UniProtKB/Swiss-Prot annotation:
UniProt keyword rRNA processing present: no
Gene3D superfamilies, alphabetized: Glutaredoxin
GO terms classed as biological process: negative regulation of protein ubiquitination; negative regulation of Wnt signaling pathway
Upper classification of the organism: Eukaryota, Discoba, Euglenozoa, Kinetoplastea, Metakinetoplastina
Source organism per UniProt: Trypanosoma brucei brucei
Protein's UniProt keywords contain Electron transport: yes
InterPro entries linked: Thioredoxin-like_fold, Thioredoxin-like_sf, Thioredoxin_CS, Thioredoxin_domain, TryX_NRX_thioredoxin_dom
Cellular component, GO, one term: nucleus
UniProt GO molecular function: thioredoxin-disulfide reductase (NADPH) activity
Name of the molecule in the record: Tryparedoxin
């Protein structure tokens, strides 16, 4: 079982552009939990920056991003997620979204938390700032 399972107890699969993928597919990767929402102006500004970083580096640096949406209706979620190249926690996992926010002390969005998928260890809590300051990922995965 993946170390992520302790944070995502109700989720066995995540959404992807091609359907669904299992949590187990993230073994060996660094995972960013991206807390965001379509109604959030700073999120709409940061998402393209993160998407560019993702497209340039996710294969070579062996990471994945998982959207943890704070959208309140499913249509907004799907419209927003449709613009993203990464994975997402399914919209119907609202209780998991709430628990993740509490677990990581997320009080505002956008927030990007870095986790070791195998162990569940938190690598960093300031990844949003690091993506902006280090767009080449020279110091990735930016431990706190």
């Amino acid at each position: 079982m993946s170390g992520l399972a302790k944070y995502l107890p109700g989720a066995t699969n995540l959404l992807s552009k091609s359907g669904e993928v299992s949590l187990g597919s993230l073994v060996g990767k660094t995972v960013f939990l991206y807390f965001s929402a379509s109604w959030c102006p700073p999120c709409r500004g940061f998402t393209p920056v993160l998407a560019e970083f993702y497209e340039k580096h996710h294969v070579a640096k062996n990471f994945e991003v998982v959207l943890i949406s704070w959208d309140e209706n499913e249509s907004d979620f799907h419209d927003y997620y449709g613009k993203m190249p990464w994975l997402a926690l399914p919209f119907d996992q609202r209780s998991t979204v709430s628990e993740l926010g509490k677990t990581f002390g997320v009080e505002s969005i956008p927030t990007l938390i870095t986790i070791n998928a195998d162990t569940g260890a938190i690598i960093g809590t300031q990844a949003r700032t690091r993506v902006i300051e280090d767009p080449d990922g020279a110091n990735f995965p930016w431990p706190n």
